Structure formats: C-alpha cells, structure tokens
Amino acid sequence: MKPIVQISLDLTNIDEALKTAALAIRAGVDWLEAGTPLILAEGLHGVRALRASFPGIPIVADLKTMDGGYLEAEMMAQAGATHVVVMARAHEETIKCVVKAGRDHNVKVMGDNLGCPDMVAGAKMLEDLGCDYVIHHIGYDDRRGIAAAGQRMPSPLDQLREVVQAVKVPVQAVGGLTLEQAIQCPQYGAPLVVLGAPLTVDADAFKTANGDLEGSLRLICEAVHSQVVPGFTA
C-alpha cells in the first residue's frame, strides 16, 4: 500500500480551511480532514464546502462519534465525507451503527482508540467490529496532563508497532508527533500519515529558503510517498 498523506484542517473558518486545503492538494496531499474544530464551528457546511471545492478528494470527517452513530455517519456521508471517525470508548452498539451506516452509504469507518486502557486491545476490538482503519491516538489533554505532572509525555510511537501487528487494517498514528516522527510512521507499518496544523510550520528540516508553506508540504509529501510500508504489498 502506498503511504497516504492526510492534512487535518483544525481550523474554525470555512474560508481559511478552503485556502489551506487548496495549498495542500497542490503540494501533493492525498486526503483532507475536516478536523473536529472545523466541524464544531461550521458543521455540515464545512464538509459540504470541502466537497464542492475538491470533488475527487477523500474527505475525513473527524466527528469523534460517541453516540447516535448511524445518524451522524449518515449526515456526514450525505454532506460529502468519504470517511468518518468513531471512538473505541463508545458503546459497542454505536460502533456497529457507524459501521452499518458506512456500508449503507459507501463511507469508510476509522476507529479511534483514544482513551482506551489497553490501546492494542482497543484497536483490535475496532477491527473486529468492522472498522476499515484504526487511529492510534494519544489525546492532547492526556499528553498535557502527564507532562504537567512531571512525567514523560506519551507518544503514539510507543505502541505503534504493537497496534500495527495486532490488526490487519491500515493504521494511523496521531497525537503530539513532530513532523519528522509523522514522516517515519510508514516504517512502523502505519501507512496513513496525518499532518496537523502545527506540523506544517514548525519543522526546520522541511522549511524552504523563503518559508514557502506549499513548498515545504511538497517536500513532506515526497518524503512520505517515496517509502514502502512494511507488510503492505498492494
């Protein structure tokens, strides 16, 4: 499987999200994510605007669904999303409902193991319930709280190989990764590389001489796309 680059549009304004998305697509980004802040601020309008502007591009709606699984997934599918996100900590029936909506509306389901006491078991459970992808996720508040207590901040890379080995579906690692770490994810067997807003501006190794963000993103995409993901041959 060829590595995929996804940009998380964690913005709160449609116009800004569309400008960033256009820049990202020109640079070679494969998937767009309507991030949770964009969905909270703009709702279905944000997803519809992305679909209207980028008709052939996969769009992930990061709903973080916890209940009302079928309706939420259905609404996002009708707005133009191709992928929706459900949380492993949701009730099993909610996950099943999202998966059913995905099948009914031709939308892929990404299961997020954020907050699971056993992250590997959470990933496996998501796969067993029918999720098409697993997001291995260390949350923002989790990382901040642990660091504030003077402990080592956890990283999704800590257990990424274990998660990848536990499931057959593609895995994405999210949460506090530096740009260089995100680019390394395919070498752990995780082919879906997500770039959050901070990652596109803070990595010196990928900044162009004139600070051109599009040029930097192009270098990042080339670095990811040039890799071969261990364990994936398709």
Which stretches of residues belong to each language-model region?
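Glycine-rich phosphate-binding active-site loops on the catalytic face of alpha/beta enzymes
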Residues: 81-93, 134-146, 188-217
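Generic structural signal for helix capping and beta-alpha/helix-loop junctions
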Residues: 41, 69, 93, 119, ...
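Active-site rim beta-loop-alpha module in soluble metabolic enzymes
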Residues: 115-166, 174
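Glycine-enriched alpha-helix->loop->beta-strand junction motifs that scaffold or abut catalytic
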Residues: 26-30, 53-57, 78-83, 103-108, ...
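Catalytic cores of alpha/beta
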Residues: 20, 68-79, 117-129, 166, ...
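Conserved N-terminal beta1-alpha1 strand-loop-helix module at the mouth
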Residues: 1-70, 126, 208-219, 233
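Alpha-helix-loop-beta-strand connector modules within alpha/beta enzyme cores
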Residues: 40-64, 97-115, 151-173, 211-234
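Catalytic beta/alpha-barrel core
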Residues: 10, 31-39, 58-66, 82-93, ...
